[in-house]
Amino acid sequence: TLFRSKYTMKTDRIDSVREQAKYEVGLEKFLSTNGIGAFADTFQDLHGLKQLPGIAAQNLMGKGIGFGPEGDYKISALSAVLMKMSEGKEGATGFIEDYTYDLTPGQELELASHMLEVPPAFAATKPEIDVIPLGIGGKEDPARLIFDGVTGDGIQVTMVDMGDHFRIICADIELVKQPKPMPKLPVARIMYRHKPNFQIGTAAWCYAGGAHHSVVSTALTRDDIAMFARLTGTELITIGEDTTEADLQKFFMK
């Protein structure tokens, strides 16, 4: 009943949806009991679970619990912190993954998504629940929320292990409406434009060591991340309208 009030049910495979609800309740109780604010999973090691957590992980992120897929503890922790920092602010914050690019000349965009676990905070419309096969993991078809993403100015933030220290990378982006419907992409997604442009923005992200898992926020700004980096003594690299081709050369200078 709760799911039907929040989401549009596109499937009649209710048992699969109930399975996700069990995961959500169980995980939330375990995390709460043990004072844990973030978690990660891997689709190779889900002993005793019939499905990879889809709606379960999505709804837990909607409650402010950090998540990282494929055992990515750094993004799990970072997303929990940034969601806490964004409380009381207007906008959305949550985990996302670089997926693919629209390389239309002069209109380049990035499509960001994940195989299941995109937080509902990014939904521009009422999310739909569907049960669709997943080609990896060797589990039953998982239920997931599907939606198109919000628009507006935002930031993309990741944290990488540099061996002797951590580095935070923060890039200014503009979230946009997807150019065309995507009926054959059965996952939630957002699309955004890199700043200052696609070529420099993506090159700077890669040269800085940017990961394909990140946190996107339309609630926080580069200044918020700079404050967090100062408070934690963490190296910070920023990318935005003020980034130039000359800045890219700094990554190759000793």
Language-model-detected regions and their locations in the chain:
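Accessory "access/gating" subregions that flank catalytic or transport cores
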Residues: 5-11, 16-48
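A short, gly/pro- and small-residue-rich
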Residues: 51-68
